[in-house]
From Swiss-Prot:
Residues 762-781, 1062-1074 have a biased composition (Basic and acidic residues). It comes from Mus musculus. This is Zinc finger RNA-binding protein. The keyword Repeat applies. Keywords: Acetylation, Chromosome, Cytoplasm, Developmental protein, DNA-binding, Isopeptide bond, Nucleus, Phosphoprotein, Repeat, RNA-binding, Ubl conjugation. GO terms for cellular component: chromosome; cytoplasm; nucleus. There is a cross-link at K509, K541, K623 (Glycyl lysine isopeptide (Lys-Gly) (interchain with G-Cter in SUMO2)).
Length: 1074
């Protein structure tokens, strides 16, 4: 509930009342001097019922409600305080009665006073009252003293409390009512009260407070009081008579039933006391004479049942005080460190491009400052927290402090009263953002605070625990660049303290304080009282990334670089002899800032010119050039690309193997499903039609009595033949197991990583050896080992079960030599120990130009690493060139043919991955033929590269994709046609520029034997004997109808020999070669 506190205006005019009443009204601020005097005054006025002294209350209501008070003030003669509400206004009217009722709210004064007894001293600090009982009325009043548009004279702002039992003493005696004035006042004033019944109050509830008013001496001045609404929380009591305050007639007081939880403003009271002292001393004599009459009137009115108060005439016209000039508002932008003239200018600045760019740059610097600092070397940076800039050295920081920009910001912050951090520099570490302290800067929207003093928003703090926060009418923050000011958060009760951005509004000093205001300027805006729990104001903590600079470290930073070449900087003067600029003859530059002279002499540009032109022995720090930095970045990028290439290659190889297994599984699944389908069709009557043989069609093309079916048979894929089943079964038996594949992948991956480390080791060794040589020659030299590649069956994916040997090719930048081979063999075990804890056996085979690596863990794998170089093939291609023989080979160069074979293996692997890997059934047939070459001696002379070319050409030349059985039959048909015989076109190597026959290593007899064996295998395929060609047992027949044995007397194949070779006994001539 917020009761109304109206603006009361007093005009002192002559009246027809007696001199005693005039003296009673002389107590301008209502300070009661003694209870007897107040009672006498009350008794005096209570004995004049016909003279119209008291106001008459319109209606006496036992229960009424407190309404929200409007902001508008009312001009009346006296302040009316209902007895039930017991809320005493800050006595803006002369209150000469009810001294006993109001003495508990403030310090009492003696009855007799002299002229010097009314000096107002500081009131004794009161202790916090104890918590009230259950039947105690609680008052929570909060006063906010801001600049008003009406007041001309300040008044006492202390809060006074009127006890319920003392209200009866404030009732005036019978007086003649004047309803015109009374009704005007009570109709405009809100009716406040309680919602309780009338039975809860005693007889004192019927009484009303009497404000005895006596016409005063005519005065042309009009005093206007601006009383602002207060917040009161009133709890009803069971019986008002039970709460009795205890007080004494002394300068101090103590209450036991009233709990005061408001905020005391002693500084404001001091200003008001000084304003009221002059008028109080003038009315000293009148107050002495009115004290006895007021005490008598209060004593008499306490037992009088009248409800009339005395009416006091007042002037009809009120003089309006002159309003002070409105202070200008200053809008400040923390990001750009500038102030704007008005809100429109400030709004346009926030929407401008300059502000947005600075804000974006600030956010970007917070995200990338740590990475940028790490790339700029290890130079320490000194940071100015006020301007939020970083300087590269102590001289630059000192120049910034003396500069106009910094001084302008300091002046602006001092004017606005903002905290100014210390000018001591902070060293910013490399991992710390340059804007480390910007996180605590204001980010809230601007808001104007139209107050003439410093005001803290402490509404969220219990006012009972905060006392002694005093403010002055004109106090400011006097801050300089050397003074540290702690930031005061506006919301102290919140868990997360934040400082909002505000608009600082200048204050005006009170018109009535006179010279006292100058004495109060030294009082701080916020004070902590020892009696109450003070609000702890947190200090701004420094960022964790920045550390204060000690004098020793600052001196070390300053002594890092000594200025040179003072004599070469000359002063340029004007006609008057005043120095207008400085000119450096070494650098051919000019500057007009005296602070920049010292920095220029220490700068890198000036020192380089000094070293070039004056002293070549001067030491200048070397910074990498842009070209060198780009070269280094290019090397790093290429290294990352190589690592990414090898990683992707491993993933592709793993994916390729998984795809092959998946395709085989899908093939077998599809084959079994279709085989079951055709078996079911064969068992059905009527040729396998589920609905009987097709009969005559009906009128609509549908057989009578049958559901409609699509016209024409559904296109079915050709089912796998028996040859396909045999080929896929054989392929499954020769495909490597999972353990073998994992072992191969493991040893190959470890070997590749170890060779990479060996290459790095050899490169570092070469750099250290050639460190004293020329930089250009060193930069252009390549690494000794350029890379390692997979070749052979490993790269082509043609591994068979039981294969333990894989091949790798190690490319060198120069021709591989025996010394290089031995160095690699020596370093490889060390690098293998770093990568894997397993043991490996390493042998150096000089004749094979290779290093053989054997694993010691089952399954034992062997890796053959062959050294080669592209230079060998390039020389081989220009053998007819005259200059080819001028380049001499190393004396211990490895075998040339082995290196050429390794290069050819690289080309073969690349061709196979591009042409044969994606061809259907090609890889499967090549595995079948490799197995045939290992089982049958006749086929062992067939070169693997020629066989791969033949299979790829046979399958790719078919008109349609071939199934495994058909593909194997087509390959045997090609060989049987005599394509490998002498005089045939042959098989040319597609990886060679010159025509080269891949079958050149075979003799004529070997060619004929393989052709004859292929023709015999083709005949076996024609008679469903493919299992003999594949070297496997016959598969069980899926259809029992076709599993009928012939009982003719023929020689059985169960004599213990291979069927493929046993058949050869019939015709000794054809099968001697198997």
């Amino acid at each position: 509930m917020i009761p109304i506190c109206p603006v009361v205006s007093f005009t002192y005019v002559p009246s027809r009342l007696g001199e005693d009443a005039k003296m009673a009204t002389g107590n301008y601020f209502g300070f009661t001097h003694s209870g007897a005097a107040a009672a006498a005054a009350a008794a005096q006025y209570s004995q004049q019922p016909a003279s119209g002294v008291a106001y008459s209350h319109p209606t006496t209501v036992a229960s009424y409600t407190v309404h929200q008070a409007p902001v508008a003030a009312h001009t009346v003669t006296a302040a009316y305080a209902p007895a039930a509400a017991t809320v005493a206004v800050a006595r803006p009217a002369p209150v000469a009665v009810a001294a006993a009722a109001t003495a508990a709210a403030y310090g009492g004064y003696p009855t007799a006073h002299t002229a010097t007894d009314y000096g107002y001293t500081q009131r004794q600090q009161e202790a916090p009252p104890p918590p009230p009982p259950a039947t105690t009325q609680n008052y929570q009043d909060s006063y906010s003293y801001v600049r008003s548009t009406a007041p001309a004279v300040a008044y006492d702002s202390k809060q006074y409390y009127q006890q319920p039992t003392a209200t009866a003493a404030a009732v005036a005696a019978a007086a003649q009512p004047q309803p015109s004035v009374a009704e005007t006042y009570y109709q405009t004033a809100p009716k406040a009260g309680y919602s309780q019944g009338a039975t809860q109050y005693t007889q004192a509830q019927q009484a009303r407070q009497v404000t005895a008013i006596k016409p005063a001496t005519p005065s042309p001045a009009t005093t206007t009081f601006s009383i602002y609404p207060v917040s009161s929380t009133v709890q009803p009591v069971a019986a008002a008579a039970t709460v009795v305050p205890s007080y004494t007639q002394s300068a101090t007081y103590s209450t036991t039933a009233v709990t005061y939880s408001g905020t005391s403003y002693s500084g404001y009271e001091a200003a008001v006391y000084s304003a009221a002292s002059s008028y109080y001393q003038q009315q000293q004599q009148q107050q002495k004479q009115a004290a006895a009459a007021a005490a008598a009137a209060a004593a008499t009115a306490a037992w009088t049942g009248t409800t009339f108060t005395k009416k006091t005439p007042f002037q009809n016209k009120q003089l309006k005080p002159k309003q002070p000039p409105k202070p200008p508002q200053i809008h400040y932008c923390d990001v750009c460190k500038i102030s704007c003239a008005g809100p429109q200018t400030y709004k346009e600045h926030l929407e401008g491009q300059k502000h947005k760019k600075k804000e974006a740059a600030l956010k970007a610097s917070q995200n990338t400052s740590s990475s940028n600092n790490s790339t700029r070397g290890t130079q320490n940076q000194l940071r100015c927290e006020l301007c939020d800039v970083s300087c590269t050295g102590a001289d630059a920081y000192a120049a910034h402090i003396r500069g106009a920009k910094h001084q302008k910001v300091v002046k602006l912050h001092t004017k606005l009263g903002k905290p100014i951090p210390s000018t001591e520099p902070n060293v910013v570490s490399q991992a710390t953002s340059s804007t480390a302290a910007s996180a605590s800067k204001p980010t809230a929207s601007p808001s104007s605070i139209g107050a003439s003093n410093c005001t803290l928003n402490t509404s969220s703090i219990a006012t009972s625990s905060v006392k002694g926060l005093s403010t002055t009418g004109n106090s400011s923050l006097n801050s300089t660049s050397n003074t540290k000011v702690s930031a005061i958060p506006t919301n102290m009760a919140a868990k997360k303290t934040s400082t909002p951005k505000i608009n600082f509004v200048g204050g005006n000093k009170l018109q009535s304080t006179g010279n006292k205001t100058e004495d109060l300027k030294g009082i701080d805006c916020v004070k902590n009282t020892p009696a109450a729990s003070a609000v702890q104001i947190p200090e701004v903590k420094q960022d964790a990334g920045s550390e204060p600079v000690t004098p020793a470290s600052l001196a070390a930073l300053q002594s890092d670089v000594q200025p040179v070449g003072h004599d070469y900087v000359e002063e340029v003067r004007n006609d008057e002899g005043k120095v207008i600029r400085f000119h450096c003859k070494l650098c051919e530059c000019s500057f007009n800032d005296p602070n920049a002279k010292e920095m220029h002499l220490k700068g890198r540009r000036h020192r380089l010119q000094y070293k070039k032109k004056v002293n070549p022995d001067l030491q200048v720090e070397v910074k990498p050039s842009i070209r060198a930095r780009k070269i280094q970045e290019e090397k790093m990028r290429k290294q990352m690309q190589k690592e990414e290439y090898w990683r992707r290659r491993e993933e592709e190889e793993r994916w390729r193997m998984e795809i092959r297994r998946y395709e085989e599984d899908m093939y077998w699944r599809r084959m079994e499903e279709e085989q079951h389908h055709w078996d079911d069709r064969r068992r059905m009557p009527d040729g396998g039609y589920p609905h009987g043989p097709p009969g005559p069609l009906g009128l609509l093309g549908v057989r009578p009595g049958m559901p409609p079916q699509p016209q024409g048979p559904a296109p079915l894929r050709r089912p796998d033949s028996s040859d396909d089943r045999y080929v896929m079964t054989k392929h499954a038996t020769i495909y490597p197991t999972e353990e073998e594949l994992q072992a191969v992948q493991k040893i190959v991956s470890i070997t590749e990583r170890a060779l990479k480390l060996v290459s790095d080791s050899l490169s570092e060794h070469e750099k250290s050896k050639n460190k004293e040589g020329d930089d250009k020659k060193e930069g252009g030299k390549d690494r000794a080992l350029k890379g390692v590649l997979r070749v052979g069956v490993l790269a082509k994916g043609l591994l068979l079960r039981g294969d333990r040997n894989v091949n790798l090719v190690l490319l060198c930048s120069e021709k591989p030599s025996k010394s290089l081979l031995s160095r690699i063999a020596e370093n490889l075990p060390k690098q293998l120990a770093v990568i894997s804890p397993e043991k490996y056996d390493i042998k150096c085979a000089v004749s094979e130009a290779a290093i053989i690596l054997n694993s010691c863990v089952e399954p034992k794998m062997q890796v053959t690493i062959t050294l080669t170089s592209p230079i060998i093939r390039e020389e081989n291609m220009r053998e007819g060139d005259v200059t080819s023989g001028m380049v001499k080979d190393p004396p211990d160069v490895l075998d040339r043919q082995k290196c050429l074979d390794a290069l050819a293996a690289l080309r073969h692997a690349k061709w196979f991955q591009a042409r044969a890997n994606g061809l259907q059934s090609c890889v499967i047939i090549i595995r079948i033929l490799r197995d045939l070459c290992q089982r049958v001696p006749t086929w062992s002379d067939f070169p693997s590269w020629a066989m791969e070319l033949l299979v790829e050409k046979a399958i790719s030349s078919a008109s349609s994709p071939q199934s495994p059985g058909d593909a194997l039959r087509r390959v045997f048909e090609c060989i049987s046609s005599g394509i490998i015989l002498k005089g045939s076109p042959g098989l040319l190597d597609p990886c060679e520029k010159d025509p080269f026959d891949t079958l050149a290593t075979m003799t004529d007899q070997q060619r004929e034997d393989i052709t004859s064996s292929a023709q015999f295998a083709l005949r076996l395929l024609a008679f469903r004997q493919i299992h003999k060609v594949l070297g496997m047992d016959p598969l069980p027949q899926m259809n029992q109808r076709f599993n009928i044995h012939n009982n003719r007397k023929r020689r059985r194949d169960s004599d213990g020999v291979d069927g493929f070779e046993a058949e050869g006994k019939k015709d000794k001539k054809d099968y001697d070669n198997f």
